[in-house]
Amino acid sequence: MHSISALLSLLGGLALSSAAPTQNITSDAYFYGQSPAVYPSPEGTGTGSWASAYEKAKAFVAQLTDDEKVNLTAGVSSKTGCSGFIAEIPRLNFTGLCVSDASNGLRGTDYVNGWSSGIHVGASWNRTLARDRAKYMGQEFHRKGVNLLLGPVVGPLGRVAEGGRNWEGFSNDPYLTGALVYETVQGVQSSGVGVSTKHYIGNEQETNRNPETVNGVDVASVSSNIDDKTIHELYLWPFQDAVLAGSVAIMCSYERINNSYACQNSKTLNGLLKTELGFQGYVITDWGAQHGGIASANAGLDMVMPETTLWGSNLTTAIANGTMEASRLDDMATRIIATWYQLNQDTDFPTPGVGMPASAQSEHQVVVGTAPDEKSTLLESAIEGHVLVKNTNNALPLQTPQLVSVFGYDAKVTDSFDLASTVLGTSPLFQNYTLWVGGGSGSNSPAYVIAPLNAIQQQAYEDGTSVLWDVSAQDPEVDPTSEACLVFINSFATEGYDRSALTDDYSDTLVTNVASKCNNTIVVVHNAGIRLVYNWIDHENVTAVVLAHLPGQDTGHALVDILYGRANPSGKLPYTIAKQASDYGSLLHPSEPQTPYGLFPQSDFSEGVYIDYRAFDKDNITPQFEFGFGLSYTTFAYSGLSIEKTNETTSEYPPSAAIQEGGNPRLWDDLVTVTAEVQNSGSVDGAEVAQLYVGIPNGPVRQLRGFDKVLLSAGETAQVSFSLNRRDLSTWNVEAQQWQLQSGTYQVYVGRSSRDLPLTGEFSI
């Protein structure tokens, strides 16, 4: 949360006149040059699959007046429910652009589904499911005339354990996040809807994300201070995968990067994104994230949302007075129109925002976004993000118990749901109800919500059994004949605020109260991020624990399928759960303003690449549940590790090649192949996520560099194969400004999680 009272106290001691740098800094001039300048902004080249789209776009833009070009670069108000809108150009049959939230379903409208959130997809560790979910979700956006989906999220990457938006992203690991964002981009865009991968870059906390005026004093956005090596090996990594997948837009974020605002940072926009990664699409602001006028255009920004007072006629004035080149405006317009052609939105695309009025309660055309063929994927995506972390004496699956008792506020659905209320500050909505999604612009508008209690009651109806429930008391009465007591709690998070803690006393007391009266207490946690469990995880009567994350509208159906054994849990943690909050060290809380930087809050990423499991490994800290951990109703055995180098004449640096989408294409050359065998050694069919970790010389102990989810019948064995490309095995050389293969021995680990790795080997380069 924003520590306003603490900030007021801090500002009380700040001199508002010029001060020495060793005291209170009062001018941002102190920070000039910390983010290197990269100019001019590169023009889109139409490389690869973009060639035809760019040819058409250039012909289109050549017909535009300067005012029409300018109008393409900023949003305007509209009568639609689109989050943002680019005005139409009727004389050229350009119908405008509707851009809308969110990464887990269309928000603020009706007749659409509420899909599982990013953290849930991350916990599934399933590439195919990620793509299918994205494809069907994109089709819903298409039917509603949405040109651009505002997502997926790969920043934040989960650096701060209490980060308020971590749940919108896939995981705390760049490789897993990159693999899943690649599939998501491809899936959504296969439907003819574009994505704007966000929030670029280093957007790792909500605290001080926007400038504020406190007690009459202006306070800038927090600055994420990241060195070049760290930005490449962690935070840029998944964006590179998104660009490689063809992401047509990238959304720049609110914060400053090395003390330059993200939406006018020429190093990250012109240098990293448009030059190094060869990005061909356009850069769009987060809402209200533009802080400079012509400077932001020259730095590589292409589109402002939801509107702007800093551009408009100022762009043409700047061209006239020489402070901006006419070619920059042409490139901005060309990039935007090229995406329209790239996605074939010039042909048979619905009217932008059709069936989406500004107010869902006003009269409007019925446009059904949902479709019958997506239902199985909707349910499967809800199922696979559940992670079973404890299951003593096979407490799960339930064996048709005659009496189940249900406790906890999270078991029931909300009394009402207002489609228009889900922007910021929705925590009261979920304090006493089941959590299917987090809060903020990343929330969604479900067609329905099947709460756990409803689904359990339906199961009892079908089985001819009984359910007792008390979902309001913290210390409920328990029928002593209950065969199982299910306790439902949650851990909410939202845009706009970081979490105040990773536990809460009310929920923990509820769990221990029930467990003291029931010797088969099963805890289900719907968690929008890391949730610590040390207060009750070792209680002898807590027999099973399911981290249910954010499943979307099919939450109850998915959970009951797992509880009753129709589905075998296969989720794995996409983050590390510590034994105690202090184990996260300096990365537990967001950075707060401190003297001498009270007016310019600083967040120093001094830990480098050591976040989440990398930090736990480095400091030899034993977690409660490690990254990649998750139980099943069956068991899996590993054997037969094989490591084969596929390129014996590997150079230290990648061979030179023309930059394409994603950067130097030689980064994707496969160098090593690792194979292993996985056997379902139990008696139940199930899916296992085989994980490959590599220890690169002079780097972290191990880093995820491959995973393969395989469905195996009881007793079945399958081979898993991992291809390691040049980027997978390289580290960023700051001096050479290239990915470099280290000389030495590379350690290889294959297994069930980041700390359960029965197969080990090595190879040398």
UniProtKB/Swiss-Prot annotation:
It is found in: Secreted. The active site is at residue 286. The keyword Glycoprotein applies. GO terms for cellular component: extracellular region. Its main location: secreted. One of its GO terms (biological process) is cellulose catabolic process. It is an enzyme of class 3 (hydrolase). It catalyses: Hydrolysis of terminal, non-reducing beta-D-glucosyl residues with release of beta-D-glucose. Pfam families: Fn3-like, Glyco_hydro_3, Glyco_hydro_3_C. InterPro entries: Cellulose_deg_GH3, Fn3-like, Glyco_hydro_3_C, Glyco_hydro_3_C_sf, Glyco_hydro_3_N, Glyco_hydro_3_N_sf, Glycoside_hydrolase_SF, Ig-like_fold. This is Probable beta-glucosidase M. It comes from Aspergillus niger (strain ATCC MYA-4892 / CBS 513.88 / FGSC A1513). The gene is bglM.
